[in-house]
Each structure stands twice: as C-alpha cells, then as structure tokens.
Amino acid sequence: MTTIALATLALTVLCLPARAKPTIPWAEFRGSGGTGVAAESRPPAKLAAPAWKAPVAAGLSAPVIAGGRLFLTAIENGRLVTCAFDVTSGQPLWKQQAPDVPLEKVHAAGSPATSTPLADEGRVYVYFGSFGLLCYDHTGAEQWQKPMPTPQSLYGMATSLIAYRDTLILVLDNDADLPGSRMSQSKVIAVRKSDGGIAWETARPLVRSGWSTPAIWRHHGGEELIVPGSGRLTSYDPQTGAEKWFTPGFSRETIAQPVSGHGRLFASAAMLGGAADEQPDPDPFWKAMLQFDADKDGKVARSEMTRYFTFPLRPELPPEHPGFGIPLPSDETQRKQRQGETFGWMDKDGDDFWTRDEFFANLKFDRGKPRLIAIRPGGTGEVTESQLAWEVNRNIPEIPSPVYWNDRLYLIRSGGLLTCVNAGDGKLLYTERVGAPGQYSASPVIAGDRLYLVSNPGVVSVVKTGDAFELLDQHDLGEPAFVTPAFDEATVFIRTQSHLLAFRAEQDAGEIDN
C-alpha cells in the first residue's frame, strides 16, 4: 500500500465519529418487547440521593422513555392527564388532559390511570379505560383520538399497549355479555399508529375481564401474539388476529405479562385471590378470620359477621386494606343474603359458629391453580399435552410478571420472596426472602447483571443475577411505590405514590459483569 493510501486511510479513521453509546429502548411497559431487561444499562447498584425528584399526580402507569423525554399518565383534579418530563433534569415539559368523561369504577387499590403509555421516535400513545386511545407527538400536540366504550371490569382496566410493526395491540377483555348471549364482549384489536383506525379485531367470547398486557413471541417458526385471559392463554397471528392455539388451566385473574427465552414462552398467574401455592396453608386465613371474633372465644359467630366483615383472600394484609378480601355488600338486603350464604358454607352443624376445625375442613382452593408454564413453539389447537415443556405450581406472584435472563426466570411475590427457576427444565435454583416484606405490585426488572425489586411499602432491593442469591443493596424510598421501574443508559427511574425519582450512575462507570 502506498504512503498516500496509508495516510488517506489514517485520516479517514481519525475522522470517523466515536461510537455512540448504545441507546436503551424503554418505550413501553417493561421496556423493549416487554422483556423487563436493559442489558446494556448501567444504573447504580447502590441507590443514594436521586439525581432529580419531580412531583407527579396519582396514577399507576409506568414511565416510558423516548426522544429524551419520559412519559406517564395520571389522574389530577378528577381529570386524566398525560405528562412529559425531561429525562436529564426531571423538568416537566408538558401536560395534556384527556377529554372530560365519567371515570370508570376501579378497585380501591387501583387507578383510572393504570395502563402504561407506548412511545416511538415521534409519538406517544396512551389508553384510558374511561375514554379510549389518544396519540400525541413529543411536544404534546394531539395527533388523533379514538373514543371507545369502557369495558366492564372487576377492578378497572389495567392492560397496556404493545406495538407490532405499524400497529398498536390492545386487549379489551370485558365482563359484559354480548346482546342476547352468555358469551362476553371481550376482544383484542390492532390499531394503526398512523391514524387510530382498526387494522383487525378478534372476538374473545370465552374470557372475561383481565389485567395482563400481551406480548409478541418471536421464535424460529415466526411471530405470535400471546394474550393471557381468564382461565386460558391464547396465541394469535399478530398480522391478522387469527387464533393459533390455546392452553387452559389458569385462574380467573390473569395479571402478569408473558416473557420468552431459551426458545420457549413463559406465562404465569396466581390462584384467584393471590394464593401463590396450589395448596396454601389454611392457618393464616383462620388467624385473619379471628380478627372479627369480637368476644375472643376462638370462634366466629354469625352475629360477628357485621357490615365490616371481610372474607380474607390475602391474609397477610390488614383487614382495612382494599386487597384484604371480599367484603359484604353495603346494601342491607344483599348483605343479609350474602351473610347467610357465606356462613352456611362452613357451618355444617348449624350451630351459628365457625370453629377452626370447620374452617379448615371446608376451606377450598379450587379457583384455578397457580401456574408458571413453559410452552414450546409449533402448536395448534389446544397445546397443553403437545407443547407444554414444564410447569411449576409454587411461589407464583399475583401481580408481578416474571423476568427472563441468561436461562433463568426470576419471580418476586408478596412478602419479598424471590424465586429463581432454571428456564430449561423448571427446576428451582433458589427461593429467598430479600428482607423487604409487604406486597409487591411492580414487576422485577434487570439492568446489566442486577435485578431491581420494588416493594409496595417503597423499598428497592438490588440483587445480583445468577444461580445463588446475593443481595447488593436496599434503599427506602420514603413513600409507597407500586410501579415497575424504567431504565436509560445510566439511570433507573422509579415512580412512587407522589414523585418520580431518577437514580443515576456516573456516565463513565466501569463495565458490568455478565
């Protein structure tokens, strides 16, 4: 090679721009593809003072990031709003109100601003069960809106949007019946990003209200849209909406988003009411019942089943918590009817008392098994026998989704119980208490080689990924937190009950061990 050529090559190399740091896509619920993983992100392993802290109105949607902006939704002064913040400084950039509509009825622990937005390079898309779909550009200018009827839901709408090519996928499961039918009005739709028009719509008449976000499963055989629902998991063609396969056996309440890896699909759901094991210990339920034993005789009398009585579903919670259990109706006539039905269920000898022995003998957990399953690709019709690789029925979370990383699945359940499962065969690698008790609503997420867990009381636990449990850090946020965190290159963003916090590492932090 000539001297001139060498000089030219050297000059060319010198003039090439430095390689840009990778952009961490976290533009939808649980990040890119809903995986819950930001492999190249470098947030701090130990959380200290936040880089910034911004006040936010109430809401349960998770933050998403695109174009240097962070987006979320909230309910403020009785109005649904979409908010944008500067990622670097936390400064509010804009806030847009949705049309003024009656708000859907939600559970006391829920919010009409629960569904997480979805963003792309130029727009942000939001869904409110009370209104429908809205699309804004990154400056807050409305691009289109699509009003929709509010589905009838047991707790309020909570599903989040996902993207497939140039469409948005939205699951509208519904407790309302079709006219003149006992089938439900449930459906899944694909909406064009460009104008909000319907690309396709598929009925789901066999399922009722649910709270899970769907997922796209990409494997060697193609792409599938995976939609959990009450009692079953269903696969559709994401281009047309045609059903491909299903597997039954899930509980009435499906909340967790499916994930994939190791050539398989993983889906989970706890038993109705949140029970994590197939045969839960009845003793905590009886101890919770005794909180209504006014005369402290060790039995529950019919007369003690007052208007304040609540049958426990989550006995670890205090009775005043909205998630504790099933209260009696406020209407006196309905309350007396329910009281008689409920009491007669266990009072087999008719003496108007529940004893411990009666309670234990008649407490039934037949509301769908808690399940974590692995499905192999390639099935059609019912695939339970043909494609089920393995199944686990213990320590299944009620709300948080599993996260997959390096051939392992991680699940966090209420009480702060972290479970790690081998994704290949379903074998338990460990189950450990992280030392941060309480309920868990936020899904576990991974950045680099670290797992970030957020408890409802507001404690963040950082755990090293791997076959053995290793707690790296715990940090008390100082207020409750119910929302899955988000990441950029060096930051973990956490929404608490009233603030948005950014915990940022130095940009030149060292390499993360994988």
Where are these regions (language model features)?
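Noncatalytic, solvent-exposed loop/strand surfaces
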Residues: A18-N514
